């Protein structure tokens, strides 16, 4: 199972609503917590021990909070390979402690696009993706949690393994984390391209979030899943059983035909081939 003991965690989250679900478990296994900004204040307000990142790094937050966790003592603590003697000697020389767990979610950039925030540029996260990617790269030694919906899985993993995580769990969370940052970057890229009215960018990312599994794919023996982009699907299912891949193709055909009508009146009947 290649278990790794979690001794130290860094927490930096935008959505703090689920912290209460994970903090008791971290306390149970005596896991030291490092945090910053609003996350630090929230953790302290809930009466849990927590070290401010500035106290740990001995370097203050600067640029109005734009630079908080971008520091060698943080990233060195995450990226070091535990079995590499050179890495461990570097840590000793610089008084850096290993960080075994990274709990980070990103600024809600996509949400701010929808409400047309005037401060949208400030929601482009830099420190968060850096922490996530560093931890995800070093999955052999570090656990990364990039989705607040995974707190239950983390607590379950720590309880089963008595304060440790398995390589299977770390690798799964690593794959998920790279998906999170890739999706996030693609949303930012699309927004900038739209600002410049660039219709055919050199690189175009098609990004989506899984809504759910379909009844089946194109054929009954095949599997299918439905993903949505940053835009709303714009449809509601009123009645009937779960939809299949072919059903969604039918819906697309119907909507395409409806869009050709000049008036907002009409009906389309579709029978798929």
Give residue spans per PLM region.
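Short, ordered loop/turn segments at secondary-structure junctions
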Residues: 15-16, 31, 37-41, 54-58, ...
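Glycine-rich nucleotide/cofactor/substrate-binding loop typically near the N-terminus or early
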Residues: 38-109
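Active-site loops and adjacent core secondary-structure elements that bind or stabilize anionic groups
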Residues: 152-157, 162-273
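A short, charged helix-loop
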Residues: 101-122, 126-165, 223, 228-235
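Short beta-strand segments
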Residues: 12, 79, 102-107, 145-146, ...
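Short coil/turn connectors at secondary-structure junctions
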Residues: 4-8, 28-31, 46-49, 72-75, ...
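N-terminal glycine-/serine-/threonine-rich phosphate-binding loop
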Residues: 1-33, 38-56
